[in-house]
């Protein structure tokens, strides 16, 4: 009987490992471009802090021939007793040609502090040229701007802050497949955790965010992180 149990456990582990390999191959075979977002025109998310609605995050997908521009707007306001404690507003534009990244620009206002970043391609070596409020210089074109709508970010060794241009080295862990219910709709999702690879960073600078993508479409469904409160982005509508 013990031999049968042992054999069953070994067979189970082999099947489990095989399923993980199949998942990785099927999930990431198309990660090179953003062509699989061809059917998306508009995405809108509600932003919650401690389960209280405080703002929104919107994406407009604008196409012209082989060019795609993704225009984003984020706004939220934390208030207490009728007083504004924290106000945030950001606008950005991300540009692609034939599904390949070309440029990114954003302006952000955090209370009275202004931040910005402009990212372009170096035509000599295809590296990224960053001009931001936190970083100015060049970096690898394998790094990706930290706009969560694009699931390519799961395979990047580092992301670039879409607010200030800061380069954030990351470790991405696949947590598992999960069903996520938002409103009256249930999504079959792939759950990932993103953490800063550099443990020497101060806590305020460390990345530790959970992201859920719809399994079939790679639609960004939800984000969550815990920093001065529990924050969530939940999808509201998309077409």
Which residues does each PLM region occupy?
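Bacterial N-terminal signal peptides that target proteins for export
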Residues: 9-17
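Sec-dependent N-terminal signal peptides
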Residues: 16-25
